[in-house]
């Protein structure tokens, strides 16, 4: 199929990070989505003038993003906030019910240093597995507020939101599609700096 990139396979699902000609990508997705387990897989597309990967890697992992094997996003319905809704909330400084709004950046320090949403909480973590302890230390500043967890593409913040809801922080949401979808749909409003990506786009 002349594809390059990474395919991660885990009990919780698949993560495909691929580049190639449009026909090759669509052909591969047709094969994957013919499987009932992946027929409703969310696909995110972006265009590049060149292929940013050197080879194709397929890896089998315990989790797509190492965090907590007991958290299975496929079995849970995490409430999401669309980019347009988040922008509206940020414009107003509160959610639609008038509740105070807090943004939690679930990325690591290196990524946050390049850019983040204005006034977002930086949990100051070096790796994602440190987030639960960071959330516990921040708990008093999150309780009673609408919390929107965000990350680059939507995977880490989905797991973070599930974890936070399990702690009783019931007004926690994830930013649908992460920062990249926010940029794509509403631009960089309320965001300062750049967004780190894991390839040469």
Each predicted region: which residue ranges?
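Rhodanese-like catalytic fold shared by cysteine-dependent sulfurtransferases
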Residues: 1-79, 98-101, 107-147, 155-201
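A conserved helix-loop-strand patch within extracytoplasmic ligand-binding domains
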Residues: 78-83, 87-89
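A short acidic-Thr-Gly-centered motif at the start of a beta-strand
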Residues: 88-98
């Amino acid at each position: 199929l002349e594809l390059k990139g990474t395919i991660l396979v885990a009990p919780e699902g698949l993560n495909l990070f691929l580049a190639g000609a449009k026909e090759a990508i669509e052909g591969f997705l047709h094969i994957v989505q013919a499987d009932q387990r992946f027929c409703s897989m969310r696909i995110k597309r972006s265009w590049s003038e060149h292929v940013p990967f050197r080879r194709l890697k397929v890896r089998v992992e315990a989790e797509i993003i190492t965090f907590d094997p007991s958290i299975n996003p496929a079995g849970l319905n995490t409430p999401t906030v669309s980019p347009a809704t988040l922008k509206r909330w940020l414009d107003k400084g509160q959610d639609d019910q008038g509740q105070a709004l807090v943004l939690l950046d679930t990325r690591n320090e290196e990524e946050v240093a390049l850019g983040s949403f204005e006034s977002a909480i930086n949990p100051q973590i070096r790796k994602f597995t440190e987030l639960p302890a960071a959330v516990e230390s921040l708990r008093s500043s999150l309780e009673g507020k609408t919390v929107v967890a965000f990350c680059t593409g939507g995977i880490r913040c989905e797991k973070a939101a599930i974890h936070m809801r399990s702690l009783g922080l019931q007004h926690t949401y994830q930013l649908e599609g992460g920062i990249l979808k926010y940029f794509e749909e509403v631009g960089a409003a309320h965001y300062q700096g750049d967004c780190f990506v894991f390839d040469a786009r």
